[in-house]
Amino acid sequence: MIYWQNRILTNVKNALGSKCPNVSSTVNNTKAKFPACAVRIVSDSAISDDLESLDEEAAVLCGVAVDIYSKTSLGHAIELMDIANKSMYAMGFKRQEGPMQIEDESSPELYHLTSRYVRVIGSEDIIEKLTFEAP
Protein backbone atom coordinates (compact mmCIF):
# COMPACT_ATOMS: atom_id res chain seq x y z
CA MET A 1 0.00 0.00 0.00
CA ILE A 2 1.31 3.43 -0.98
CA TYR A 3 0.54 5.97 1.75
CA TRP A 4 2.19 9.33 2.37
CA GLN A 5 -0.16 11.03 4.90
CA ASN A 6 2.53 11.76 7.50
CA ARG A 7 5.02 13.35 5.09
CA ILE A 8 2.33 15.46 3.42
CA LEU A 9 1.05 16.64 6.82
CA THR A 10 4.57 17.41 8.06
CA ASN A 11 5.45 19.41 4.95
CA VAL A 12 2.28 21.54 5.16
CA LYS A 13 2.79 22.03 8.92
CA ASN A 14 6.40 23.13 8.40
CA ALA A 15 5.37 25.51 5.60
CA LEU A 16 2.73 27.20 7.77
CA GLY A 17 5.13 27.37 10.72
CA SER A 18 4.22 29.81 13.47
CA LYS A 19 1.50 31.44 11.35
CA CYS A 20 -0.68 28.37 11.94
CA PRO A 21 0.74 26.06 14.62
CA ASN A 22 -2.46 23.99 14.90
CA VAL A 23 -2.13 21.59 11.93
CA SER A 24 -3.56 18.07 12.10
CA SER A 25 -4.87 15.24 9.97
CA THR A 26 -8.24 15.11 11.69
CA VAL A 27 -11.35 17.22 11.92
CA ASN A 28 -13.22 16.72 15.16
CA ASN A 29 -15.59 18.50 17.50
CA THR A 30 -13.07 19.34 20.20
CA LYS A 31 -12.49 23.01 20.90
CA ALA A 32 -9.82 24.04 18.41
CA LYS A 33 -7.26 26.80 18.69
CA PHE A 34 -7.34 29.15 15.72
CA PRO A 35 -5.99 29.50 13.16
CA ALA A 36 -6.11 25.81 12.31
CA CYS A 37 -5.41 23.59 9.31
CA ALA A 38 -6.59 20.06 8.55
CA VAL A 39 -4.72 17.99 5.93
CA ARG A 40 -6.53 14.75 5.04
CA ILE A 41 -6.15 12.00 2.47
CA VAL A 42 -9.63 11.86 0.90
CA SER A 43 -8.92 9.30 -1.81
CA ASP A 44 -6.10 6.89 -2.43
CA SER A 45 -7.22 4.65 -5.27
CA ALA A 46 -4.92 2.20 -7.01
CA ILE A 47 -4.52 3.08 -10.68
CA SER A 48 -1.85 0.55 -11.61
CA ASP A 49 -0.83 -2.84 -10.27
CA ASP A 50 2.65 -4.31 -10.12
CA LEU A 51 2.90 -6.81 -13.00
CA GLU A 52 5.51 -8.91 -11.19
CA SER A 53 3.55 -9.13 -7.95
CA LEU A 54 -0.20 -9.02 -8.46
CA ASP A 55 -0.87 -8.22 -4.81
CA GLU A 56 1.01 -4.88 -4.85
CA GLU A 57 0.11 -1.43 -6.10
CA ALA A 58 2.39 0.22 -8.62
CA ALA A 59 0.72 3.64 -8.38
CA VAL A 60 -2.13 5.42 -6.62
CA LEU A 61 -4.10 8.54 -7.42
CA CYS A 62 -3.81 10.40 -4.12
CA GLY A 63 -6.41 13.05 -3.27
CA VAL A 64 -5.73 15.45 -0.41
CA ALA A 65 -8.09 17.97 1.18
CA VAL A 66 -6.63 21.03 2.90
CA ASP A 67 -8.96 23.01 5.16
CA ILE A 68 -7.97 26.34 6.72
CA TYR A 69 -9.88 27.87 9.64
CA SER A 70 -9.38 31.44 10.88
CA LYS A 71 -11.27 33.73 13.23
CA THR A 72 -9.26 36.77 12.11
CA SER A 73 -10.53 37.45 8.58
CA LEU A 74 -11.13 35.91 5.20
CA GLY A 75 -7.90 37.57 4.03
CA HIS A 76 -5.99 35.79 6.79
CA ALA A 77 -7.49 32.43 5.77
CA ILE A 78 -6.53 33.14 2.13
CA GLU A 79 -2.95 34.00 3.19
CA LEU A 80 -2.63 30.68 5.05
CA MET A 81 -4.19 28.74 2.16
CA ASP A 82 -1.66 30.32 -0.22
CA ILE A 83 1.20 28.99 1.93
CA ALA A 84 -0.38 25.52 2.10
CA ASN A 85 -1.01 25.63 -1.67
CA LYS A 86 2.66 26.37 -2.38
CA SER A 87 3.75 23.43 -0.21
CA MET A 88 1.32 21.09 -1.99
CA TYR A 89 2.65 22.21 -5.39
CA ALA A 90 6.23 21.73 -4.13
CA MET A 91 5.32 18.07 -3.46
CA GLY A 92 4.00 17.63 -7.01
CA PHE A 93 0.28 17.96 -6.26
CA LYS A 94 -2.05 19.98 -8.48
CA ARG A 95 -5.09 21.80 -7.17
CA GLN A 96 -8.24 20.11 -8.44
CA GLU A 97 -10.70 22.53 -6.83
CA GLY A 98 -10.74 25.49 -4.50
CA PRO A 99 -10.04 27.38 -2.55
CA MET A 100 -13.73 27.53 -1.76
CA GLN A 101 -15.20 29.34 1.21
CA ILE A 102 -17.39 27.14 3.39
CA GLU A 103 -19.97 29.12 5.34
CA ASP A 104 -21.28 27.70 8.60
CA GLU A 105 -24.35 29.49 9.93
CA SER A 106 -23.66 28.18 13.43
CA SER A 107 -20.18 29.83 13.44
CA PRO A 108 -20.42 33.03 11.36
CA GLU A 109 -17.22 34.37 12.97
CA LEU A 110 -15.21 31.46 11.52
CA TYR A 111 -13.60 31.77 8.07
CA HIS A 112 -13.19 28.33 6.48
CA LEU A 113 -11.52 27.63 3.14
CA THR A 114 -11.09 24.23 1.51
CA SER A 115 -9.01 23.05 -1.45
CA ARG A 116 -8.49 19.61 -2.98
CA TYR A 117 -5.31 18.37 -4.61
CA VAL A 118 -4.37 15.29 -6.63
CA ARG A 119 -1.17 13.55 -7.61
CA VAL A 120 -0.16 10.17 -8.99
CA ILE A 121 2.27 8.54 -6.57
CA GLY A 122 4.23 5.52 -7.78
CA SER A 123 5.52 2.77 -5.51
CA GLU A 124 9.08 3.98 -6.09
CA ASP A 125 8.28 7.69 -5.65
CA ILE A 126 9.58 9.60 -2.68
CA ILE A 127 7.98 12.76 -1.35
CA GLU A 128 10.93 14.68 0.03
CA LYS A 129 10.84 16.42 3.37
CA LEU A 130 10.61 20.08 2.43
CA THR A 131 12.38 22.88 4.25
CA PHE A 132 10.89 26.33 4.49
CA GLU A 133 12.05 29.73 5.62
CA ALA A 134 10.21 30.90 8.71
CA PRO A 135 7.13 32.83 7.55
Positions of predicted regions on the chain:
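Short, charged interaction patches at domain edges and termini
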Residues: M1-T10, S45-S53, E57-L61, R95-P135
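Residue-level recognition of well-ordered beta-strand positions that form the cores
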Residues: R40, A65-Y69, R116-V120
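Short connector loops at helix/strand junctions that flank enzyme active sites
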Residues: A32-A36, A59-G63, I83
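Mid-chain, well-packed structural core segment of small domains
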Residues: A65-Y89
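Small/polar-rich, solvent-exposed N-terminal microdomains that initiate assembly or binding
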Residues: M1-S53
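Short beta-strand and beta-hairpin "edge-sheet" elements
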Residues: K86-G98
